[in-house]
UniProtKB/Swiss-Prot annotation:
The active site is at residue 233. The keyword ATP-binding applies. The keyword Hydrolase applies. Participates in replication and packaging of the viral genome. Plays a crucial role, together with NSP5, in the formation of virus factories (viroplasms) which are large inclusions in the host cytoplasm where replication intermediates are assembled and viral RNA replication takes place. Displays ssRNA binding, NTPase, RNA triphosphatase (RTPase) and ATP-independent helix-unwinding activities. The unwinding activity may prepare and organize plus-strand RNAs for packaging and replication by removing interfering secondary structures. This is Non-structural protein 2. ATP binds at residues 119-121, 201, 229-231, 235. One of its GO terms (cellular component) is host cell cytoplasm. Its cofactor is Mg(2+). Homooctamer. Interacts with VP1; this interaction is weak. Interacts with NSP5; this interaction leads to up-regulation of NSP5 phosphorylation and formation of viral factories. Its EC number is 3.6.4.-. Residues 214-249 are annotated as: RNA-binding. One of its GO terms (molecular function) is hydrolase activity, acting on acid anhydrides. It comes from Rotavirus B (isolate RVB/Human/China/ADRV/1982) (RV-B).
């Protein structure tokens, strides 16, 4: 199962703008603004859309009583207990705070969250790979606000991912119908949870069936499982990592992969061995 981190693990909104998050101090969580109290009571009712409520909680300013010497205590409903390397936390937090000093950027950031984000929770692995791009001073994310926001939003499934919004990776093949990316293991100083082996993703360049791309993917990925999970690209998974997936996840992936192949009959010859291996 994918490990998650929250936007509130990094920054918290206040009346004077955004400040660093202090997850360690839990005693001050009792202090709430009137709006935060109402949101907490609504959140307790399991019938409500909790993902939407978490977004509202993040965008709700915290009162000064939640301030500590290190930052602001986030509401317990929107933080995680994920063990995060300090290098990852510092890099992402500093980048966000520097970006949000500009009022126009802050307004666009909040509009993006309220209109596109399905939740404040992100994939820890995706965010770690995003941080690797921030670490690279030559990366275009450091120079283009729009591209940076799209790449950041992709970590939260806020936009449909493309090869341009992916985290740190290498282009290893380019055919007439697709681009293949290689994702190497995340360095320990950025990694949350268990390490993942090298895997690959295929991004089609059009709506046509990427036959040549699939042949190239099969060549570079070797004996890895191919899966389609509904995000517009095909991903490989090393077979030993299938053991970490739940039965529910495996059934869902198999169903989506078979649906994909039913609409792309020419690819059956290339990838059918991977689908059948799950029987």
């Amino acid at each position: 199962m994918t490990q998650s981190v929250s936007l509130s693990d990094f920054i918290v909104k206040t009346e004077d703008g955004y400040m660093p998050s202090d997850r360690e101090c839990i005693a001050l969580d009792r202090y709430l603004s009137k709006e935060q109290k109402e949101l907490r009571e609504t959140f307790k009712d399991g019938k409500n859309d909790r993902a939407a409520l978490r977004i509202k909680m993040f965008l709700c300013p915290s009162p000064s009583r939640r301030f500590t010497q290190h930052g602001v205590v986030p509401m317990r409903e929107i933080k995680t207990n994920t063990d995060m390397p300090s290098t990852l936390w510092t890099l992402v937090t500093d980048w966000l705070l520097n970006l949000l000093q500009d009022e126009e950027n802050q307004e666009m950031f909040e509009d993006f969250i309220s209109s596109k984000f399905p939740d404040v929770l992100a994939s820890a692995d995706k965010l770690a790979r995003f941080a690797q791009r921030l670490e690279d001073r030559k990366d275009v994310l450091r120079k283009n606000f729009g591209k940076a926001m799209n790449a950041f939003g992709a970590c939260f499934w806020a936009i449909k991912p493309t090869f341009a919004t992916e985290g740190k990776c290498n282009v290893v093949r380019a055919s007439d119908d697709s681009i293949i990316l290689e994702f190497q293991p995340v360095p320990e100083y950025f990694r949350c949870g268990k390490s993942k082996a090298t895997f690959y993703k295929l991004y089609p360049l059009s709506d046509e069936q990427p036959v040549n791309g699939m042949l190239a993917l099969k060549a570079v990925a070797g004996n890895q499982f191919f899966m389609y999970h509904g995000h517009g690209h095909i991903r490989t998974v090393p077979y030993h990592e299938l053991l970490t997936l739940s039965n529910h996840s495996l059934v869902k992936i198999k169903k989506r992969s078979k649906t994909f192949l039913n609409h792309h009959s020419q690819l059956n010859v290339v990838v059918n061995f991977s689908i059948c291996s799950m029987e």
